[in-house]
């Protein structure tokens, strides 16, 4: 009896203890989760993030939290918190979840170092911390006790230092992804000791040294990613040919040299080989044809030579062949047309010659076809779009002849048609002008002929280029149906008739070139309604009538060419208000009257802009040739005696006019010093007449909507930059101008171009600046010298320009908003120190007395913040956006507009590029966009500036940093090894 009672007591005690243990453990996990929520959310997290994670007295409440899975004992065994997003850090309390088997906290914004308490999670099978901002060295020691770990994913973080070696001892580890970080040094030899590894990702780091041949010992490995931004020495290890289970080998963009090892042909299970963007040489080994499973082969952007091996006809599974930008030669083998699964063939920029295989595309699978810049001849294969799925058809810069195949006009899947610079002839299939998805149709520089179809449509077409062909007939009125069209080029053809007014009703149209045709009739009045226009060229036609009234509505127009027509009437006075117009050509027409003066007319060279108009009078000239000519013509009807008298009077008058002119010129020179007044903001040993004498055509160093800039060499040996302002200013009598310019003259900062003074008379204002002998940043980035501007210099210029803007926004009195930040307004002195220029002028250049208006000038195309479109206001965050565009220019080396397709600016292009990456990360994106002219740059530094740039160009102004914050970020880059081991050599 006593034994039974004792047994019951022990049983009750055990049950109570177990129940207490469950309760304690349950509440312990609840407390840990609540601590995690508090730490991981961060200040920037949205209110609803993890909102269901709340305290409760229920033992199982935490098991119903989003992303939480419990076992039968109410212990947390899985935590999956993905894409919340979170902005805090991972706290030490994570170690309390000791039964955790799966920790997945990917795609958030968690920062700081990983806590050492992770070492307590000895039951972990999956640790996924990818797509966060964790930093510091990866603490490999935390994995020592994780003997069950099968997958470790730390992709796309900010870990630095050497690769962790402790993880090699994890016998069950199958998946290791450390790509997209800042790991440096060499790949440890010990990485060949993994026993079960199937996936190894070390790409997109800063690794150097040789790729260890010993990695070939990883016999279970199926995927090996080693490329992208790593900078190895040597080439592909031949021993890799023994990795019999390998399915994917990626070693792209990692500075590989040497030849492709023939031993890779032994990888019979390999389906993808990516070795593009390296320095590989030699020919393609025929042995690669033994890779019977191969589907994707990318050898692009190397220095490979020779021909495509005939043995590649065995590769029946090939879907992708990227061979572009090499030195391959010979013909494209006929077997390529027989590959049953081929979808992508891109071989542009090689030396391929002869004809294309006639059956190319006959497999019914083609998606992408690009053979640009080769020496290919013959006819275009007729079945390229047999699949009905072809997206790109690009054969530019070859020697193709014959017609465009009818099938291209029926290929509704196409997005790009580019056949320029060939010898194509015959009419264009009408369907080409009705494809719904095409964004660019480029047929220029061929011998295409016939009339354009009367039915034209295409809801996606943004660029239509038919230049330099033999097209005839009228321009179809249906052209107006192209509602997405931004650029229209019909120049150098044989079009006749009038320009359809509907052309200028296309809502997004920015560029029109219809020059060099046989067009007649007037310029359509609808042109004045298309405010989006930036360039119009109607020259070399037979257009007549007057220039339509209302041209001043085209405030974004920068180029207008109406030369070599029969246009008559006066030169429109309203052109003076077209402040963006920097190129105007009205030469060789029948304009009459007097050329207007002032405003934007000060930008133009009269002798070139208005040449060849015999009845046009120029201002400030002694006589008007047309008037004198008409007078003489009428006198011919009179008697010889009267004619002689008139001629005598005319000659006497001419002599008198010459004498008067000489007298006036001498008088003007005598009184020039009295007509101009110099106001100096520091001691200047120059006179007003010294400045005025420099206003000569040969001294012009720049033109823009704000005025003309001259280089002035003063008698004392100093050089100054003289800016002649264009606008409605009233010279020295404009007291608003004087007050504001004198305020600007007091600004002193080493990174702001100093205003030395100004010279004015009653009509004109001349601003005097320090002369910057090295020109503008824009000239260095986008001119011939761009490749010589190394990364260190670019970063230095960014810091200095940021400091100048920061001073204007935060420390200047009064505070100044620049309103036209761009690379051309960042000037470089003799020591290449950056100086911000043209600050604060926009608010009074065009509207004297309205200097409080913040919307009189929005900036320059490509730099304008998006909010201007609906607020018509600018503030300091608008400057920040523009500066972000400048930072992108420094990184990418391309202009903000004009190089990414019509209607796409540099910000939109970067975002589009990011969306197209298969594995998006800062590293991958930077490598995809970085200026190819740069060599040997520290990747960490480029990524750091790129991240700052993307913060600056955020769509909403309040989300952008201040310039003070920008300076702080630029001057405090992340700590990294900046030795040559951290350099990427492209």
Curated annotation (Swiss-Prot):
Protein location: Cell membrane
Glycan attachment sites: 80, 102, 109, 128, 141, 255, 266, 279, 317, 351, 513, 518, 561, 590
PROSITE patterns: PROTEIN_KINASE_DOM (PS50011), PROTEIN_KINASE_ST (PS00108)
Keyword Chloroplast attributed: no
LRR repeat extents: 71-97, 98-121, 123-145, 146-170, 171-196, 198-218, 243-267, 268-291, 293-314, 316-339, 340-363, 365-387, 388-411, 412-435, 437-458, 459-482, 483-506, 508-530, 531-554, 555-578, 579-603
Sequence intervals crossing the membrane: 645-665
Any Gene Ontology CC annotation: plasma membrane
Protein kinase domain: residues covered: 695-971
Phenotype on disruption: Increased number of root nodules when inoculated with Mesorhizobium loti. Inhibition of shoot and root growth. Increase in arbuscular mycorrhizal (AM) fungus colonization intensity in roots (enhanced mycorrhizal phenotype) when inoculated with AM fungi.
Secretion signal, residue range per the UniProt entry: 1-25
Sequence similarity: Belongs to the protein kinase superfamily. Ser/Thr protein kinase family.
Organism listed in the record: Lotus japonicus
BP-aspect Gene Ontology terms: cell differentiation
GO molecular function terms noted in the UniProt entry: ATP binding; protein serine kinase activity; protein serine/threonine kinase activity; receptor serine/threonine kinase binding
SUPFAM superfamilies linked to this entry: Protein kinase-like (PK-like), RNI-like
Reaction(s) catalysed by this chain's protein: L-seryl-[protein] + ATP = O-phospho-L-seryl-[protein] + ADP + H(+); L-threonyl-[protein] + ATP = O-phospho-L-threonyl-[protein] + ADP + H(+)
Residues annotated as binding ATP: 701-709, 723
Function: LRR receptor kinase involved in the regulation of root and shoot growth, and root nodule organogenesis. Involved in long distance nodulation signaling events. Involved in the autoregulation of nodulation (AON), a long distance systemic signaling from root to shoot and back again, which allows legumes to limit the number of root nodules formed based on available nitrogen and previous rhizobial colonization. Acts from shoot to root to control AON. Involved in the regulation of root colonization by arbuscular mycorrhizal (AM) fungi.
Keywords: ATP-binding, Cell membrane, Differentiation, Glycoprotein, Growth regulation, Kinase, Leucine-rich repeat, Membrane, Nucleotide-binding, Receptor, Repeat, Serine/threonine-protein kinase, Signal, Transferase, Transmembrane, Transmembrane helix
Membrane-topology descriptor: Single-pass type I membrane protein
Catalytic center residues: 820 (proton acceptor)
Gene: HAR1
Name of the protein in its database record: Leucine-rich repeat receptor-like kinase protein HAR1
């Amino acid at each position: 009896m006593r034994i039974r009672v004792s047994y019951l007591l022990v049983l009750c005690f055990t049950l109570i203890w177990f129940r207490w243990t469950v309760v304690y453990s349950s509440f312990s996990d609840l407390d840990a989760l609540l601590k995690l929520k508090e730490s991981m959310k961060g200040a920037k997290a949205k209110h609803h993030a993890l909102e269901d994670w709340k305290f409760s007295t229920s033992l199982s409440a935490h098991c119903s939290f989003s992303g939480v899975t419990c076992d039968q004992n109410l212990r947390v065994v899985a935590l999956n918190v993905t894409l919340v997003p979170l902005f805090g850090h991972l706290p030490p309390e994570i170690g309390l979840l000791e039964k955790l088997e799966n920790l997945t906290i990917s795609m958030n914004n968690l920062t700081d170092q990983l806590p050492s308490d992770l070492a307590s999670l000895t039951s972990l099978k999956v640790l996924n911390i990818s797509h966060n901002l964790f930093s510091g060295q990866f603490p490999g020691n935390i994995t020592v006790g994780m003997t069950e770990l099968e997958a470790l994913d730390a992709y796309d973080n900010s870990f630095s230092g050497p690769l962790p070696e402790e993880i090699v001892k994890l016998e069950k580890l199958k998946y290791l992804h450390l790509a997209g970080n800042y790991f440096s040094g060499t790949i440890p030899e010990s990485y060949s000791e993994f026993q079960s590894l199937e996936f190894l990702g070390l790409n997109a780091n800063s690794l150097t040294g040789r790729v260890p041949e010993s990695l070939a010992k990883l016999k279970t490995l199926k995927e090996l990613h080693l490329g992208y931004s790593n900078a190895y020495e040597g080439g592909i290890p031949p021993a890799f040919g023994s990795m019999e289970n390998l399915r994917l080998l990626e070693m792209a963009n990692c500075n590989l040299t040497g030849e492709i090892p023939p031993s890779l042909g032994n990888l019979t299970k390999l389906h993808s080989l990516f070795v593009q963007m390296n320095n590989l040489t030699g020919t393609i080994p025929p042995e690669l044809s033994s890779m019977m499973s191969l589907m994707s082969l990318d050898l692009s952007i190397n220095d490979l030579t020779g021909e495509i091996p005939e043995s590649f006809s065995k590769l029946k599974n090939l879907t992708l062949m990227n061979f572009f930008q090499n030195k391959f030669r010979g013909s494209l083998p006929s077997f390529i047309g027989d590959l049953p699964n081929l979808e992508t063939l891109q071989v542009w920029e090689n030396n391929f010659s002869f004809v294309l295989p006639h059956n190319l595309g006959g497999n019914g699978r083609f998606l992408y076809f690009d053979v640009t810049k080769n020496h290919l001849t013959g006819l275009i294969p007729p079945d390229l779009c047999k699949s009905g799925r072809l997206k790109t058809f690009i054969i530019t810069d070859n020697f193709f002849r014959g017609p465009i195949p009818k099938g291209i006009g029926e290929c509704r899947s196409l997005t790009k048609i580019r056949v320029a610079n060939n010898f194509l002839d015959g009419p264009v299939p009408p369907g080409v002008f009705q494809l719904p998805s095409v964004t660019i149709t480029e047929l220029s520089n061929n011998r295409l002929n016939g009339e354009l179809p009367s039915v034209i449509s295409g809801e996606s077409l943004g660029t239509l280029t038919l230049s330099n062909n033999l097209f005839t007939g009228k321009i179809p009125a249906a052209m107006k149906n192209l509602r997405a069209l931004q650029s229209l080029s019909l120049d150098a053809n044989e079009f006749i008739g009038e320009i359809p007014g509907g052309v200028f009703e296309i809502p997004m149209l920015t560029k029109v070139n219809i020059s060099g045709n046989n067009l007649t009739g007037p310029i359509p009045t609808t042109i004045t309604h298309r405010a989006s226009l930036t360039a119009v060229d109607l020259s070399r036609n037979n257009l007549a009538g007057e220039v339509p009234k209302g041209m001043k509505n085209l405030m974004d127009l920068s180029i207008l060419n109406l030369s070599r027509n029969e246009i008559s009437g006066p030169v429109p006075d309203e052109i003076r208000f077209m402040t963006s117009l920097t190129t105007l050509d009205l030469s060789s027409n029948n304009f009459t009257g007097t050329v207007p003066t002032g405003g934007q007319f000060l930008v133009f060279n009269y002798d070139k802009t208005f040449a060849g108009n015999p009845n046009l009078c120029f201002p400030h000239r002694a006589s008007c040739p047309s008037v004198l000519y008409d007078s003489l013509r009428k006198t011919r009807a009179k008697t010889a005696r009267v004619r002689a008298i008139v001629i005598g009077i005319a000659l006497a008058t001419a002599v008198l006019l010459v004498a008067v002119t000489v007298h006036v010129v001498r008088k003007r020179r005598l009184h020039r010093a009295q007509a101009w007044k110099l106001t100096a903001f520091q001691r200047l040993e120059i006179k007003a007449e010294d400045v005025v004498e420099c206003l000569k055509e040969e001294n012009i160093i720049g033109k823009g909507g704000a005025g003309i800039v001259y280089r002035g060499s003063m008698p004392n040996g100093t050089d100054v930059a003289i800016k002649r302002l264009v606008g409605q200013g009233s010279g020295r009598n404009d007291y608003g101008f004087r007050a504001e310019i004198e305020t600007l003259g007091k600004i002193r900062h080493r990174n702001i171009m100093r205003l030395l003074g100004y010279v004015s008379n009653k009509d004109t204002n001349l601003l005097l600046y320090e002369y910057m002998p090295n020109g503008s940043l824009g000239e260095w980035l986008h001119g011939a010298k761009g490749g010589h501007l190394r990364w260190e210099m670019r970063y230095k210029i960014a810091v200095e320009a940021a400091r100048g803007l920061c001073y204007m926004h935060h420390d200047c009195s009064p505070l100044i908003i620049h309103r036209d930040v761009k690379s051309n307004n960042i000037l470089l002195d003799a020591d290449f120190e950056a100086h911000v220029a043209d600050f604060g002028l926009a608010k009074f250049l065009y509207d004297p007395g309205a200097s409080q208006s913040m919307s009189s000038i929005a900036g320059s195309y490509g730099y304008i913040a998006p909010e201007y479109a609906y607020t018509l206001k600018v503030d300091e965050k608008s400057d920040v956006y523009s500066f972000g565009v400048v930072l992108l220019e420094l990184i990418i080396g391309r202009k903000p507009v004009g190089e990414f397709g019509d209607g796409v600016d540099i910000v939109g292009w970067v975002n589009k590029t990011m969306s197209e990456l298969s594995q998006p990360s800062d590293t991958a994106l930077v490598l995809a966009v970085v200026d190819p002219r740069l060599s040997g740059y520290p990747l960490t530094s480029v990524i750091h500036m790129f991240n700052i740039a993307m913060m600056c160009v955020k769509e909403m102004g309040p989300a952008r940093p201040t310039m003070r914050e920008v300076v702080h970020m630029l001057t405090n880059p992340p700590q990294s090894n900046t030795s040559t081991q951290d350099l990427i050599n492209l």
